[in-house]
Amino acid sequence: NGTIGAIMDDEGKLICIPTVEKVLRSLPTNELAAYAPIIGLPAYLEAVKNLTFADNKPDGYLEAVATAGGTGAIHNTIWNYSEIGDSVLTSDWYWGTYNVLCQEAGRKLETYELFDENMNYNIESFTDKVNTLLADQDSLLIIINTPAHNPTGYSLSEEDWDKVLDVCKEHA
């Protein structure tokens, strides 16, 4: 079970990949225990952008942000980009922690159907839900878990992304 950011065995004991443990134990104490700068290590942030986008960097403002893990990033996003009482949108296949984070922040988690009857990305369901929610609130935070969607493994295609962006641009 690696859904909480750590891998546990069947008895609930933490599993550490031997290669990772070897590298960690080889680090000098000052590298192992030191805090990184609050904004993150510049070389790391640049590497994140390069690995994420490679030759496909969008034209526009682009910045990597260091957070205390993926869950912390989602938590901060919910708090900072939605209002108390608002709905946050994600697909009906989602990591259960999204709901906990929304409830804790006084938001509601709403879902759309990820797949249509042909097991393709369901842009119609996405569009309908976006339109419905934006009829009742001023802005909408949308969590789209791609590539390698957890738990399905599905990744939006470029065509899917174009359709999603078209829906978002209609409300910009």
Spans of model-derived segments:
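Conserved core of the PLP fold type I
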Residues: E31-H171
